[in-house]
UniProtKB/Swiss-Prot annotation:
GO biological process: protein homooligomerization
Name of this protein: A-type voltage-gated potassium channel KCND1
Natural source organism: Mus musculus
Native organism taxonomy: Eukaryota, Metazoa, Chordata, Craniata, Vertebrata
InterPro entries associated with the record: BTB/POZ_dom, Ion_trans_dom, K_chnl_volt-dep_Kv, K_chnl_volt-dep_Kv4, K_chnl_volt-dep_Kv4.1, K_chnl_volt-dep_Kv4_C, Shal-type_N, SKP1/BTB/POZ_sf
Intramembrane extents: 360-371, 372-379
Length: 651
């Protein structure tokens, strides 16, 4: 509407002051105030992807972002679109909800990202359709458990390394929960595990009967009564280790209240408490039963192995996650036991010498039958009792078998989650090790490079820099291109000096060409030549273009070029193939030099009578500093000039 007003308003103002008569030019049509209609098409641009829908489609849900007036904050007046910088793939499912009224959860998308999109558009997760609701809840539960495990692992010290200024409590807690962080923590881990095993074994061995003493050889007694001092010292040492571990864990715990309420803390207390109670309780007949009961609690020390066994922890997590299924199983078994015990009692009530004396006495038979154990100490004798006993056995199989797949699936899920977490941690360790190795290798290579003279200090004061004395990357690329040209064409490029790619060192090759030119002569130490590719030893035979004879490269003519001196003008011969840096380009090297190349071309056929022989230049045998390049034919023995000079542009 503002655009229409801006169109006709200047005409009206000009006519009012007499600048422009209204009759000279027709006015544009006056803007019409359009009432908002439900059949208006709205364009929604989500990260560049345009979606079109009816306005009344979005108005179905006025409590959401797209159905309320809040979407006007995202309106772009220039394009006439509602722009949202969100995921367009997710928005497709959101828009389908406005169209159909059913919200579907995409399987290929992250469940957390899907929840974030729903929260942005003002949609609640309860709107997910029944077809996707179960899968949505399972994925959300699995994701929440994984995030909780990652948070616990990070708190336990399995995450990134602690900062340098970490406190003693943090280091102790990390050592207890993740023993592989240091050698001392690993030693303490194995020591506590050893004493747990010793304590459990001693608790078992002290009940074994031993031979009598020399004074009473016929009297048998347990090993605990035969050697009380040894077992007491062993138990004392184990309890002291367990007490010290518990106190250190309590001191280092991030939240002491949470640690005291944890299951492992209760196991630790139950494992060490009977020992201290036995020290202060006198051994007499009045409290002997209570003392024996306290000694029974020592067997709970075996649960301390759960800290050292990953499988036991997985089993505990499985039972915790299957609490509802286990509760259903217990409730079903309780109902079935009560029902069948009552039926069996009244079915066997009329018989003499029956073992089903009461309904609680029949509980034992029902439990043994439903769990398919069948000890045989209690059996029905009547026909009705046998029939109901068979029904009890079959119902027990069904009741117990139904929750088992759920428990197994939860165990498998938790186990695979743990395996993936271990794999991620192992991969992270490998990546960190590779990064450290790469850094170490790079540092060593740099130091070796500097030691070999590859770098030198230039400048003084704050402007001191490292100047690379090796050849530039441009020149190395040029050498590689020369080698590729030699492989692709029939020409051979040869340099008289060797070039070391490792440190950019130039060394004399000590090789001479068959050519008699200047470039084929041995060069002194001050020469500016360097080589890229050495001359190949095996020279294959080729067939000439205008000849029927097959000759080798040994009989081919060589076109030699002169070496370009330092800061010399651009040559007009084939030596322009050599790396020639631009004069205005400041390369990171000490010197600018050119490389002389020897290009071998096939020998043309012998001169026919029609062709005219060019005259030999003066001093034809020399290869001195003449700019003209000579062509020699070993078969003719007469030097001749090349009719035209081949020019190749420099790289």
């Amino acid at each position: 509407m503002a655009a229409g007003v801006a169109t006709w308003l200047p005409f009206a103002r000009a006519a009012a002051v007499g600048w422009l008569p209204l009759a000279q030019q027709p006015l544009p049509p006056a803007p019409e105030v359009k009432a908002s209609r439900g059949d208006e098409v709205l364009v929604v641009n989500v990260s560049g992807r345009r979606f079109e829908t009816w306005k009344n489609t979005l108005d179905r849900y006025p409590d959401t972002l797209l159905g309320s007036s809040e979407k006007e904050f995202f309106y772009d007046a220039e394009s006439g679109e509602y722009f949202f910088d969100r995921d367009p793939d997710m928005f497709r499912h959101v828009l389908n909800f406005y169209r159909t009224g059913r919200l579907h959860c995409p399987r290929q998308e992250c469940i957390q990202a899907f929840d974030e999109e729903l929260a942005f558009y003002g949609l609640v997760p309860e709107l997910v359709g029944d077809c996707c609701l179960e899968e949505y809840r399972d994925r959300k539960k699995e994701n929440a458990e994984r995030l909780a495990e990652d948070e616990e692992a990070e708190q336990a010290g399995e995450g990134p390394a602690l900062p340098a200024g970490s406190s003693l409590r943090q280091r102790l807690w990390r050592a207890f929960e993740n023993p592989h962080t240091s050698t001392a923590a690993l030693v303490f881990y194995y020591v506590t595990g050893f004493f747990i095993a010793v304590s459990v074994i001693a608790n078992v061995v002290e009940t074994i009967p031993c031979r009598g003493t020399p004074r009473w050889p016929s009297k048998e007694q347990s090993c605990g009564d035969r050697f009380p001092t040894a077992f007491f010292c062993m138990d004392t040492a184990c309890v002291l280790i367990f007490t010290g571990e518990y106190l250190l864990r309590l001191f280092a715990a991030p939240s002491r209240c949470r640690f005291l309420r944890s299951v492992m803390s209760l196991i630790d207390v139950v494992a060490i408490l009977p020992y201290y109670i036995g020290l202060f309780v006198p051994k007499n007949d009045d409290v002997s039963g209570a003392f024996v009961t306290l000694r029974v609690f020592r067997v709970f020390r075996i649960f301390k192995f759960s800290r050292h066994s990953q499988g036991l922890r997985i089993l505990g997590y499985t039972l915790k996650s299957c609490a509802s299924e286990l509760g259903f199983l217990l409730f079903s078994l309780t109902m079935a036991i009560i029902i069948f015990a009552t039926v069996m009692f009244y079915a066997e009530k009329g018989t003499s010498k029956t073992n089903f004396t009461s309904i609680p006495a029949a509980f034992w038979y029902t439990i043994v039958t439903m769990t398919t154990l069948g000890y045989g100490d209690m059996v029905p004798s009547t026909i009705a009792g046998k029939i109901f006993g068979s029904i009890c056995s079959l119902s027990g199989v069904l009741v117990i078998a139904l929750p088992v797949p759920v428990i197994v699936s939860n165990f498998s899920r938790i186990y695979h989650q743990n395996q993936r977490a271990d794999k991620r941690r192992a991969q992270q360790k490998v990546r960190l090790a590779r990064i450290r190795l790469a850094k170490s290798g790079t540092t060593n290579a740099f130091l070796q490079y500097k030691q070999n003279g590859g770098l030198e200090d230039s400048g003084s004061g704050d402007g001191q820099m490292l100047c690379v004395r090796s050849r530039s990357a441009f020149e190395q690329q040029h050498h590689h291109l020369l080698h590729c040209l030699e492989k692709t064409t029939c020409h051979e490029f040869t340099d008289e000096l060797t070039f070391s790619e490792a440190l950019g060192a130039v060394s004399l090759g000590g090789r001479t060409s068959r050519s008699t030119s200047v470039s084929s002569q041995p060069m002194g130490p001050g020469s500016l030549f360097s080589s890229c590719c050495s001359r190949r030893v095996n020279r294959r035979a080729i067939r000439l273009a205008n000849s029927t004879a097959s000759v080798s490269r040994g009989s081919m003519q060589e076109l030699d070029t002169l070496a370009g001196l330092r800061r010399s003008p651009a040559p007009q011969t084939r030596s322009s193939l050599n790396a020639k840096p631009h004069d205005s380009l400041d390369l990171n090297c000490d010197s600018r030099d050119f490389v002389a190349a020897i290009i071998s071309i096939p020998t043309p056929p012998a001169n026919t009578p029609d062709e005219s022989q060019p005259s030999s230049p003066s001093g034809g045998g020399g290869s001195g500093g003449t700019p003209n390049t000579t062509l020699r034919n070993s078969s003719l023995g007469t030097p001749c000039l090349l009719p035209e000079t081949v020019k190749i542009s420099s790289l």
